[in-house]
Amino acid sequence: MFKNVFSSLQKVGKSLMLPVSVLPIAGILLGIGSAHFTLIPEIISQIMAQTGGSIFSNMPLIFAIGVALGFSNNDGVAALAAVVAYSILIQTLSAVELNILNTDANTIKNKNFSDIGILGGIIAGAISAYMFNKFYKIQLPEYLGFFAGKRFVPIISGLFAIFVGLILSLIWPSIGNKIQIFSEWAAYQNPIIAFSLYGLVERALVPFGLHHIWNVPFQMQIGEYKNSIGQIFHGDIARYMAGDTTAGNLSGGFIFKMYGLPGAALAIWHTAKKENRKKIGSIMISAALTAFLTGITEPIEFSFILVAPILYIIHAILAGLSFPLCIFLNMRAGTSFSHGFIDFIVLSGHSHKIFLFPIVGICYGLLYYSIFYFLITTFNLKTPGREENKNTVFFRNNIEIAPYIVEALGGKNNIKNLDACITRLRITVSEISKVNEENLKNLGAAGVVISGSGVQAVFGTRSENIKTAIDEYINNI
């Protein structure tokens, strides 16, 4: 049962990656536009701010589409059904409150009864995905034949959304109130504790690929801010971009991603065996540069997470502590996607005490380096370059590596589903016993996570391109 739940949660995490992928463009537009840089004409700033804000305003709908695609093998009909389901769900909530419960229209507007945010989008996406998987092959009488098959999915999704909306209209005020209480606590009353917990749990979930689920409420939901033209923004990311001076509580990510983990990578390089130091150095420097520039840290983390779990536990604790440290020092910087140098510079318009980030960051990097170096050498941890020699095979391009990955996964017929997120391949296989974990690592995977029939292989930022190469290879054999 646990494996089935875990597999489902992995699908949820994967499906949330598509809507999250629009955050960079939304963040850049809103962040730069709201900063009103003197070099940019005011009319251009206003256009950028409003277009970026419109993306954030429509994030619930974007999440609905993303969830629907994630659970329907990227079928466009499910995405269309999600749009229908979300629209009907929201309007049902408003109609019930106004016409059945006789709630005053101004009260509905002020208390946002129909604004169930990202959760509403996820619910609508789940409805459409479920209906797609259940009814996309349905057969109807000949006189209704036009509506058979996939055309039936938007219809049944919309009808079911009315039913769900009726139920939510009765229970949402209570649920929404509790969510609002948590939101107020996390964003305004005690952000130090809230974001300490956020950072610790977020890193703890990375090995399982479930951290995207945990990110959503903090990044996209907590807090509320209304700008000068009446646009309302939720979540720490959008509020910061829009100019909310109480946002920016996610700033701690810059400390451990840009400085802390590169310090750990340096320690792994320096503690490698002398004969392996050159090879490990090139790998770790590349991974550290990726983390510094883009905030993508899995290539470093998976280099020690499986061989030295104690290092990852300490890393998760240090990552969690970086958030309250920045809040305590009143350091604020914005992120649109991940905490890297690109975000740090591009979104610096609303930053506060920006000069402290490299100072605190370098200190954090030295702390990481010292702890990792001490533990690796004292307890002889088998981090990269300290283990027995491995026959790692290096390939010049993704087309060359694709056949070997398919073979390591048990062959074409053993692969039931193949997908990729930012840093890892996500595969569902028929027989897990046919998967050769060691070969996947020898092919360059920084780590391999197996649970039930699910396999995750961490190939870093190459993962999406490798997935495309594997798809092309499978289609041609």
From Swiss-Prot:
It is found in: Cell inner membrane. Residues 399-477 form the PTS EIIB type-1 domain. InterPro entries: Glu_permease_IIB (IPR036878), PTrfase_EIIB_Cys (IPR018113), PTS_EIIC (IPR003352), PTS_EIIC_1 (IPR013013), PTS_Glucose_EIICBA (IPR050429), PTS_IIB_1 (IPR001996), PTS_IIBC_glc (IPR011299). Its main location: membrane. The keyword Nucleus does not apply. Residues 1-388 form the PTS EIIC type-1 domain. It catalyses: N(pros)-phospho-L-histidyl-[protein] + D-glucose(out) = D-glucose 6-phosphate(in) + L-histidyl-[protein]. The chain crosses the membrane at residues 20-40, 51-71, 76-96, 112-132, 152-172, 250-270, 280-300, 304-324, 354-374. The modification Phosphocysteine is found at C421. The active site is at C421 (phosphocysteine intermediate). It is a multi-pass membrane protein. One of its GO terms (molecular function) is protein-phosphocysteine-glucose phosphotransferase system transporter activity. Its EC number is 2.7.1.199. Pfam families: PTS_EIIB (PF00367), PTS_EIIC (PF02378). The phosphoenolpyruvate-dependent sugar phosphotransferase system (sugar PTS), a major carbohydrate active transport system, catalyzes the phosphorylation of incoming sugar substrates concomitantly with their translocation across the cell membrane. The enzyme II complex composed of PtsG and Crr is involved in glucose transport. This is PTS system glucose-specific EIICB component. It comes from Buchnera aphidicola subsp. Schizaphis graminum (strain Sg). The lineage of its organism: Bacteria, Pseudomonadati, Pseudomonadota, Gammaproteobacteria, Enterobacterales.
